[in-house]
């Protein structure tokens, strides 16, 4: 009975659900971000082989976030998570200048997939607390984001360990999903 009321209230008050795919190269901070959003604390992580999935509630939206491992050997498995994805969070280690070209190649490969043609793109320029971190403007240029004329995208500087920028990113995603009619 309680569940019936809950579903009724969700319909009346308009709770939305959105499927988000969070990907990026290994060690970019995806799992740390997921659990900082979910639990509000830093958890000890190990490299993700497979995926983690959690629901994160923000502003009456229930984001189902799929955090998929980023090691090169398992990146081909990303495509199995594309179906019904409304938003992509692509996490970049802003301090890893040696692999930014690799990140660009993976992002471009994914954005060319037909199943993701309508998905919004949020880039988290993570690890901004490190002294050698690339700025969001530099990452925008390195990833070629300015050439994405047919896709809504946004880049947000973040620090997964402090939580800086994470909710600002979700705010953009929530507003962009509403504008795009994905609600």
Curated annotation (Swiss-Prot):
Belongs to the small GTPase superfamily. Arf family. GO terms for molecular function: GTP binding; GTPase activity. The keyword Isomerase does not apply. A lipid is attached at residue 2 (N-myristoyl glycine). It comes from Ajellomyces capsulatus (Darling's disease fungus). The keyword Transport applies. The gene is ARF. GO terms for biological process: protein transport; vesicle-mediated transport. Its main location: Golgi. Pfam families: Arf. GTP binds at residues 24-31, 67-71, 126-129. It is found in: Golgi apparatus. Keywords: ER-Golgi transport, Golgi apparatus, GTP-binding, Lipoprotein, Myristate, Nucleotide-binding, Protein transport, Transport. Signal peptide: none annotated. GTP-binding protein involved in protein trafficking; may modulate vesicle budding and uncoating within the Golgi apparatus. This is ADP-ribosylation factor. GO terms for cellular component: Golgi apparatus. It comes from the Eukaryota.
């Amino acid at each position: 009975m309680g569940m019936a009321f809950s579903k009724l209230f969700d319909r009346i008050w308009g709770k939305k659900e959105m499927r988000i795919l969070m990907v990026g190269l290994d060690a970019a901070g995806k799992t740390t971000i997921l659990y900082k959003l979910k639990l509000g604390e830093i958890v000890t992580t190990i490299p993700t082989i497979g995926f983690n999935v959690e629901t994160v509630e923000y502003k009456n939206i229930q984001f189902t976030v799929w955090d998929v491992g980023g090691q090169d050997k398992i990146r081909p498995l990303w495509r199995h998570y594309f179906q019904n994805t409304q938003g992509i969070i692509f996490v970049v280690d802003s301090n890893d200048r040696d692999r930014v070209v690799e990140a660009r190649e993976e992002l471009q490969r994914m954005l060319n997939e037909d199943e993701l043609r309508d998905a919004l793109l949020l880039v988290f320029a993570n690890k901004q607390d490190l002294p050698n971190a690339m700025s969001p403007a530099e990452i925008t240029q390195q990833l070629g984001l300015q050439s994405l004329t047919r896709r809504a995208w946004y880049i947000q500087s973040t620090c997964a360990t402090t939580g800086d920028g994470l909710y600002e990113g979700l705010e953009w995603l929530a507003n962009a999903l509403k504008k795009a009619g994905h609600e």
